[in-house]
Amino acid sequence: MKVVQGDYRGEGLKIAVVVPRFNDLVTSKLLEGALDGLKRHGVSDENITVVRIPGSMEAIYTLKRLLDLGVHDAIIVLGAVIRGETYHFNVVANEIGKAVAQFNMNSDVPIVFGVLTTDTLEQALNRAGAKSGNKGFEAAMVAIEMANLRKKLRRDFLEPHSNSRQ
């Protein structure tokens, strides 16, 4: 039996972090957590790209452009969508979630969903470092692990086959 899994060694990995300015009180804390996690695990400053966008819906366009560039080992999408008085919350939360899932199905680059969808600002702040850990930090760990898993899957399954065809 072969078991393949990623690890938390970030040396040499190129990671993009997409973060909206909307709900900056929360998203800035998520970004701090993500950057802390990446750097603690060896991802160097020069290999981290932070892309600031207006709001969470703009992440869909930004993800497509970053994937087209083909230079990142993983992409983290952060955000805070907080329920308001209108249906807008449902639209934004559903569309960004569907888009990330779709990109993950159709891309070779892991995209990590670090968008908080909460009923209140307090819940969002709690998940951005106040009481329930920092989901940005957690997203960084997932990005590193998945980027390494991607590399290991290629190495273990693609490279042996390409050598045998020569």
Swiss-Prot record:
Q: Which reaction does it catalyse?
A: (2S)-2-hydroxy-3-oxobutyl phosphate + 5-amino-6-(D-ribitylamino)uracil = 6,7-dimethyl-8-(1-D-ribityl)lumazine + phosphate + 2 H2O + H(+)
Which pathway does this polypeptide act in?
Answer: Cofactor biosynthesis; riboflavin biosynthesis; riboflavin from 2-hydroxy-3-oxobutyl phosphate and 5-amino-6-(D-ribitylamino)uracil: step 1/2
Q: Which GO terms describe its cellular component?
A: cytosol; riboflavin synthase complex
| Binding annotation for (2S)-2-hydroxy-3-oxobutyl phosphate | 85-86, 127
Q: What is its EC number?
A: 2.5.1.78
Query: Record's SUPFAM superfamilies?
Result: Lumazine synthase
Keyword presence, ATP-binding: no
The record's keywords, sorted A to Z, are: Riboflavin biosynthesis, Transferase
Q: Name one GO molecular function term.
A: 6,7-dimethyl-8-ribityllumazine synthase activity
Q: Where is the active site?
A: 88 (proton donor)
User: Which enzyme type, at the first EC level?
Assistant: transferase
**Job description of the protein:** Catalyzes the formation of 6,7-dimethyl-8-ribityllumazine by condensation of 5-amino-6-(D-ribitylamino)uracil with 3,4-dihydroxy-2-butanone 4-phosphate. This is the penultimate step in the biosynthesis of riboflavin.
Per its UniProt record, what PANTHER family does this chain match?
Answer: 6,7-DIMETHYL-8-RIBITYLLUMAZINE SYNTHASE, 6,7-DIMETHYL-8-RIBITYLLUMAZINE SYNTHASE DMRL SYNTHASE LUMAZINE SYNTHASE
Q: Which family does it belong to?
A: Belongs to the DMRL synthase family.
Identify this protein by name.
Answer: 6,7-dimethyl-8-ribityllumazine synthase
Name the species this protein comes from: Thermotoga neapolitana (strain ATCC 49049 / DSM 4359 / NBRC 107923 / NS-E)
